[in-house]
């Protein structure tokens, strides 16, 4: 059950057997009997939905979950540096995405680090949707749930959840208190006039800054009630008027947004005065008891701004850990660019496998354990990290290789006519995995003549007189070859005989029983399409399953097409890596 929950609802016999044998080596003599039992139990577990598996695990095996959490704490402690002034049981972290788009690999870093630190210190993690900009960063109604799904897929569990657009009354109350203590003022002058005073070092003399508390409260009430139009007034936080960074000087806490033109997907046009990121985030971090903020170093300026707000209200600022940017080479990670591609119809959706969105990586065949391992290895380093896809692929390969079934396929298939077969019909029993722990399939081939298919990339390498080993089957001698057709005859049966001739080993597919396949291979901004044929066992594949196309690479089943009778017509796969 634990194996299934950890791998998207699909348990595998191999890893379960490996775990049993590792913990109970005394059972090795009974391995054959045990694997039969394990296979039966795995089949039963895989019939359950992921939610049913999780429920049963929590209800019946909660001790297993706690044991796993303890191991995770110990592992995290070895990989992550300690947080400053962190007390066990009192650490509160948060992940605060903007639901204007789904999350990508870069966003996953603060999410995973915040979660892992919460686990490490037996604290709690908060999920907070920061959606207070309905005009520029318009929230997508579907993004809230999509982000939740991505986080759950990554193995992240949060203790509390908040949506900022549903907390507007709280921000209004805090804004009023800020005005009352002289920490904010309403600015109804033009942005150009404010910038002139600010940039000339005369901000102390800026007329709106000199207003009384009573005047500002009256103007604030007008802002909230809709008396001002968009761009006619803002609420500013008083800071150091001579701060060396001009952008820090009296930053904007609230602005007017015409929600009759730009309605918010959750609250419509109920509000017109909207808090900026720096105001809402700072207030929530205090009210939600956040003790440690983990975020990219690009937010360092925001930390400085928010500290002025805290000082006005007599609050203590949380500890902040800034880390560098994380970039996946060759992938687009800019939200604006990704949105532009979607709007232009260039992409196949938010889960386009060319994108570094979590959904895109998942669809491509990257498993959550690989993403977690990558992020933990990068950690909280202050320097920017540029990761090649090869690095991520290497981690992913090490995880999926032990549990991925092997399937033979011929891309751009070329027929090979084989004569002289010493049988009328022969069954080849081929294991799905070299370990022999994932079961086997049967591939049949008639005789004394038969046609098989091989990949065109192999066919063009063949020449008259070549001895070739057909994987897990027999050896042939090439009689004649062209890029479109190969003639051959039976040579011998065993691998040893093939080795004597240094024969290459290639995959093959019977001509009389096969399944059409389509492999989509992301290459930069291109999605290269390759068609082919796969062995009959491909008909058993399910969407979401990750396999290895022998000598081609690992791929994830994207879809399975059937005819009106339910017979599999085609399997579409997305290439992950070699």
Curated annotation (Swiss-Prot):
It comes from Hyperthermus butylicus (strain DSM 5456 / JCM 9403 / PLM1-5). GO terms for cellular component: cytosol. It catalyses: tRNA(Glu) + L-glutamate + ATP = L-glutamyl-tRNA(Glu) + AMP + diphosphate. This is Glutamate--tRNA ligase. Belongs to the class-I aminoacyl-tRNA synthetase family. Glutamate--tRNA ligase type 2 subfamily. PANTHER family: GLUTAMATE--TRNA LIGASE (PTHR43097:SF5), GLUTAMINE-TRNA LIGASE (PTHR43097). One of its GO terms (molecular function) is glutamate-tRNA ligase activity. Its EC number is 6.1.1.17. Catalyzes the attachment of glutamate to tRNA(Glu) in a two-step reaction: glutamate is first activated by ATP to form Glu-AMP and then transferred to the acceptor end of tRNA(Glu). A motif ('HIGH' region) lies at residues 97-107. It is found in: Cytoplasm. Keywords: Aminoacyl-tRNA synthetase, ATP-binding, Cytoplasm, Ligase, Nucleotide-binding, Protein biosynthesis. GO terms for biological process: amide biosynthetic process; glutamyl-tRNA aminoacylation. Pfam families: tRNA-synt_1c, tRNA-synt_1c_C, tRNA-synt_1c_C2.
